Regions:
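Low-complexity, glycine/proline-biased repetitive segments and flexible coils/loops
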Residues: 1-192
């Protein structure tokens, strides 16, 4: 699942294989929901199948609030500071939540994580005192969330979400009032 942006416009996290994180939004607006997994783990004829998890909550704040992280194949996305419920804050910007972890497989000959969730975008501004980082991508190729434009860790276009890692199937990171990253390409495994 992809991370969500920190923003002033109400929105929701979208459903997917794993759900997207909820956006951060100002107090006085309805608390936005995170996305749900459309293929959660469930029993089947030969064991369980499906590995989706929901996204995390964004921050409900009087200033710019960070978005929640997207769900990964292994764990749900996180809200701010790892909380799984809406947080309120009066701080001058809040970081994004981390993406959920993916699942580990040894199909390549070594243990590798796949399908991590994207990190949520940080909620900040151009004010240098509001230097806010995006959430970390989940283990398994999730993209990092975008930081505020003047974060001390910022590079050009740092407020954009980062793409998921190629061939890992991770979600893209959310932006800081900007574009989110693209999900990383997956892999095809042929057993013979």
């Amino acid at each position: 699942g992809g991370g969500r942006t920190g923003e002033w416009t109400p929105g929701i996290g979208y459903d997917g294989g794993s759900g997207g994180g909820a956006p951060g939004n100002p107090t006085g607006q309805p608390i936005p929901s995170f996305g749900q997994a459309t293929q959660p783990q469930q029993p089947g004829d030969s064991g369980s199948y499906g590995f989706g998890n929901p996204g995390g909550y964004g921050v409900h704040t009087t200033n710019d609030g960070g978005g929640g992280g997207g769900g990964g194949a292994g764990t749900a996305g996180q809200g701010i500071s790892g909380h799984s419920y809406p947080q309120t804050s009066s701080a001058a910007g809040t970081p994004g939540g981390n993406g959920g972890a993916g699942k580990q497989y040894d199909i390549s000959g070594s243990q590798v994580y796949y399908a991590g969730g994207g990190g949520g975008g940080g909620g900040g501004s151009d004010n240098p005192l509001w230097s806010i980082t995006g959430g970390q991508g989940g283990q398994g190729g999730g993209g990092f969330g975008g930081a505020s434009a003047r974060s001390p860790h910022a590079v050009t276009n740092a407020y954009h979400g980062h793409d998921g890692v190629a061939n890992r199937g991770g979600g893209g990171g959310g932006g800081d009032n900007s574009n989110g990253g693209s999900g990383g390409s997956g892999i095809v495994i042929v057993k013979y």
